[in-house]
A protein has these predicted regions:
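Ligand-binding "clamshell"
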Residues: 42-51, 78, 196-208
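Mature extracytoplasmic/periplasmic domains
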Residues: 222-291
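Periplasmic-binding protein-like
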Residues: 61, 65-66, 157-161, 199-223
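A bilobed periplasmic-binding-protein/Venus flytrap-type ligand-binding module shared by bacterial periplasmic
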Residues: 93-98, 214-228, 246-247
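Early extracytoplasmic/lumenal segment of secretory-pathway proteins
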Residues: 1-40, 175
Length: 400
């Protein structure tokens, strides 16, 4: 009321278009949601202004510095650049009736989704996931897997998960697929899971124990703001007790960043959400390096798209052959592990007379150039062709 804020306009661009959107619109006040890596990226582009309003900083001081090991504030030289307005974890949603109908085991961990048991119905997919270029939350899940299992094994697990499922155009579409029973499982950010449990009985959110992380979802002031005082007043309200009540709405189901909101009359009506809050707090997360994730952000996204989504049919064909031979007893455990790793290990290809491998270091070396689009079409073509050749070679070697 003090700043006469009577209306808000929201823009929700694809995550890879945030930079272009901020530049094109020119007078956006606030960046909100999307995860820490995206916000740290905005900081590196010089788009984020420090939050310096004393009243707002006083409310920020009421927010814990971390939750479950995850930072809830980002400072640079003592200046606050973003503060979390909500908490997220990352796991998957299970449609229990479909799981039972299809005779699939109940998954608890990421590697369960990459198991041959989830490939028994191929080419029918059992898992929904989004292309990382279309979803920051699913991008985070792929980054979690890579950091939990290491670069090479992480990609091998992601490959099998991708083969067991199918790529969707976004996280909402993947969510709809598990809710409708089109698939048995969808990877997801937590609040999709909590909302699904309320709206679609029979669905359940699973947080993989010691295999995930907690994120603080940021809100920040942009340098393009033409109303910085009003913008900071909005930030102040969002992280206040009253503002945090919006997450309690059963149509929203987000995890508040303030525990004291659960002590309000509205909060006492959500013992289910408070139980999830405490379960998330108690879950042992993995050590996660935001800077590492940021250093391979574009490389990871575009590699995934080219290798697992663009040539998905061939990936499924190769994995299905491995699964069938293994489950039919035509392949030993040792042979299965060999072929399962061969399917998804980082690709190698010839470039300028040299053999190049998609190592972590190589991904970091081309990341910025991919982000600007400079090398994008070149490597998308190289990766698609190399992936297609690998899958075809596996099919031929296994007599497919």
């Amino acid at each position: 009321k003090e700043y006469n804020i009577t209306g808000l306009s929201f823009i929700g661009p694809n995550p890879v278009l945030w930079r272009q959107t901020i530049e094109a619109v020119g007078d956006l006040d606030i960046a909100w949601g999307g995860g820490p890596t995206l916000f740290d990226e905005l900081i590196s582009f010089g788009f984020v202004a420090p939050i310096n309003d004393e009243e707002t900083l006083a409310v920020v001081a009421e927010i814990p510095d971390e939750f479950g090991g995850a930072p809830l504030k980002r400072y640079d030289d003592g200046k606050l650049l973003w503060v979390a307005s909500a908490i997220s974890s990352f796991g998957f949603i299970v449609n229990e009736p479909v799981l039972n109908e299809w005779g699939l085991p109940y998954p608890q961990l990421w590697e369960d989704l990459a198991s041959p048991e989830f490939g028994v119905l191929l080419p029918k997919p059992t898992i929904a996931y989004a292309r990382p270029t279309q979803s920051t939350s699913h991008t985070r899940i792929y980054e979690i897997i890579l950091q939990k299992f290491g670069w090479d094994q992480g990609w091998a697990i992601i490959a099998r998960l991708a083969a067991n499922g199918r790529p969707y155009s976004g996280s909402v579409e993947a969510l709809s697929a598990v809710q409708s029973g089109e698939v048995a499982v969808s990877i997801a950010i937590d609040f999709y899971g909590y909302s699904s449990e309320v709206q679609f009985p029979g669905t359940k959110y699973v947080l993989p124990f010691n295999e995930s992380i907690v994120n603080g979802d940021p809100i920040a002031l942009l340098k393009t703001s033409t109303h910085p005082d009003a913008a900071q007043a909005f930030i102040r309200w969002i992280i206040s007790v009253d503002g945090q009540k919006i997450w309690l709405d059963k149509s929203v189901n987000r995890m508040p960043v303030r525990e004291d909101v659960f002590k309000t009359p509205e909060g006492r009506k959500r013992p289910d959400l408070y139980a999830n809050y405490n379960a998330t707090k108690a879950n042992i997360g993995i050590p996660f390096d935001d800077n590492l994730a940021l250093s391979i952000e574009y490389s990871m996204r575009y590699y995934f798209d080219a290798v697992f989504a663009d040539v998905h049919d061939k990936l499924v064909q190769a994995w299905s052959l491995i699964v069938t031979k293994y489950l039919n007893g035509e392949m030993s455990q040792e042979e299965f592990e060999y072929w399962a790793y061969e399917l998804g290990k980082p690709l190698s290809w010839e470039e300028d007379g040299q053999i190049v491998t998609f190592t972590l270091e190589f991904a970091q070396s081309i990341n910025d150039a991919l982000g600007t689009g400079e090398l994008l079409s070149k490597y998308q073509k190289i990766w698609r062709e190399a992936a297609n050749a690998r899958y075809q070679s596996i099919i031929e070697q296994l007599g497919g």
